[in-house]
Amino acid sequence: DLKGARILLVEDNDFNIMVAQDELQASIPDVQVDVAKNGIEAVARVKAKTYDLVLMDVQMPEMNGYDATRAIRALGGTYEQLPIIAMTANVMKAEVQRCIDAGMTGFIPKPFERNELLATLHSVLSGRQGE
């Protein structure tokens, strides 16, 4: 059950932010979506608040998604288990592997389909404890 999920959306493109927020809010009851526009903001937000999942764009200014994921994983403890899902238009096998090597948990190609997004979120969050 994804109800009430706390999701950090890390994306620098305003249109993509709007689309992702709309999809998440239309699909998940009581979802909480916070936005970070680059990797530096993402790491700061993850340190400041508990999230169930991070949706991470990989190509961003200041700090990309790979480096942000590595920085989050380096925090240790529960941060090593935090689901981080890559969002990228590049679906080449090498790109998917690069995301996994950086410590990401899953992968969603952009532009994403609502069903694909929800299936990925369900599979990643199926073990989360309800508050």
Region roles according to the model:
Residues 1-131:
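C-terminal compact regulatory domains
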